[in-house]
């Protein structure tokens, strides 16, 4: 599968750059554009943005590889267990996550304020904030919105202590341990700066969780009752 979209060339940084841009992106000589809007590549050299400027990009929305790694160690009763999880070789189109519809302000996220273009934030990874129609320049399907979603997540971590045999014997237990546990503690991803979860882009982010667990087992004896 492929995506059909325009090839983005970054964001306009000044009105002068827009005035000198050779490609008419809005059919009005770029009169509706402003600094912070997406600029596109003129593929056929006719200076007009049309279907001839579309390119085909491989739809890699499913990972090429999913992986996990479990590690564990123990020493004199102390133990640690770690699990890492990740995926490589896939991308997602995040346009719909940024361009909210009218009446959808509940989808307004932190990154709409912290990583959108402003004169004081010219290196932002998202366009300027504005009210826009469905055919707005920044809502066109383009490579600008295709983002790398490779990630590595610290899925679980457990740190604990297991009582030693001598202590267990005094307490008449077969085993006992206590551990600090955490899930989804850290995620390394290029989307992290935007506050997006690569595994849950269109849903509620996977939450961190913490807890303390204790487990103990006593000596058990099995009894059988004979019926005559």
Regions found by a protein language model. Give the residues of each.
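Conserved small/polar residues in nucleotide/adenosyl-binding loops
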Residues: 218-225
């Amino acid at each position: 599968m492929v995506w059909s979209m325009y090839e983005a060339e970054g964001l306009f940084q000044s009105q002068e750059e827009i005035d000198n841009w050779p490609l008419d992106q809005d059919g009005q000589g770029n009169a509706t554009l402003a600094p912070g809007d997406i600029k596109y590549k003129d593929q056929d050299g006719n200076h007009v943005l049309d279907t001839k400027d579309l390119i085909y990009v491989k739809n890699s929305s499913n990972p090429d590889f999913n992986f996990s790694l479990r590690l564990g160690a123990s020493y004199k009763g102390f133990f640690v267990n770690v699990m890492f999880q990740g995926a490589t070789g896939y991308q997602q189109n995040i346009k719909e996550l940024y361009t909210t519809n009218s009446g959808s302000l509940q989808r307004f996220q932190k990154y709409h304020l912290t990583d959108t273009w402003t004169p004081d934030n010219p290196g932002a990874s998202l366009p300027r904030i504005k009210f826009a129609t469905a055919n707005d320049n920044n809502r066109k399907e383009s490579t600008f919105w295709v983002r790398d979603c490779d990630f590595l997540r610290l899925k679980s971590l457990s740190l604990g202590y297991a009582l030693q045999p001598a202590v267990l014997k005094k307490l008449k237990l077969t085993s006992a341990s206590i551990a600090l546990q955490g899930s989804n503690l850290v995620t390394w991803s290029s989307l992290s700066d935007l506050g997006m979860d690569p595994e849950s882009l269109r849903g509620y982010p996977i939450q961190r969780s913490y807890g303390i667990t204790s487990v103990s087992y006593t000596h058990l004896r099995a009894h059988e009752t004979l019926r005559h």
